[in-house]
Amino acid sequence: MFDYIKGQLTKITAKYIVVEANGLGYIIYVANPYSFSDSVNQTLTIYLHQVIREDAHLLFGFHTENEKDVFLKLISVSGIGPMTALAIVAVDDNEGLVAAIDNSDIKYLMKFPKIGKKTAQQMILDLSGKFVTIPEGGQAQQMPKAKGNQQLDEAIEALLALGYKATELKKIRAFFEGTDDTAEQYIKSALKMLMKG
């Protein structure tokens, strides 16, 4: 089992990042890969959780230990797998998640990808009162704004990887078309919009 990895960030995709440590490149699934954009080719520390399956060993990474703690609590709930938990952690407002669980707000919880009524009820049952700390969200600094829509395309691709439907994301794309921002900021803004419905 791993607690964290310290190495050089060598690659960012819509679903994962690659960190090289001791000559090996580790694929690490993260909530918002583009939040690491300012750290490409730099040494960084990523907190890890390893999932071992019959067909694969997967690493899930987090900016902070608090993010990791939220993820671990989420995957302890029956019906929530690691990818669904990552999609929930990706939402910047984890205060909203904690409040929804503590206030039994099923409708709010059902806004997350792949969370139905039954799973939302199970989240409330299993996690109510269990969040002592709230994660700070992404720790990455903003990178300089890029021209064109490449950043928006990357953000949409990352949201698809988190489990959001293409039909939902058409509205997001239309809303942000013609704007100039980073993929990280597009993702944060889009997640807030998606959670509001």
Curated annotation (Swiss-Prot):
Q: Where is this region: Flexible linker?
A: 142-146
Identify the stretch(es) annotated as Domain I: 1-63
Q: Which cellular components does GO assign to this protein?
A: cytoplasm; Holliday junction helicase complex; Holliday junction resolvase complex
Classification via InterPro entries = DNA_helicase_Holl-junc_RuvA_I, Hlx-hairpin-Hlx_DNA-bd_motif, NA-bd_OB-fold, RuvA, RuvA_2-like, RuvA_C, RuvA_C_sf
CDD domains with a match to the protein in the record:
UBA_RuvA_C (cd14332)
For the keyword Signal, the answer is no
Q: Which GO terms describe its biological process?
A: DNA recombination; DNA repair
About its domains, the entry says:
Has three domains with a flexible linker between the domains II and III and assumes an 'L' shape. Domain III is highly mobile and contacts RuvB.
Q: What is this protein called?
A: Holliday junction branch migration complex subunit RuvA
Organism whose genome encodes this protein:
Streptococcus uberis (strain ATCC BAA-854 / 0140J)
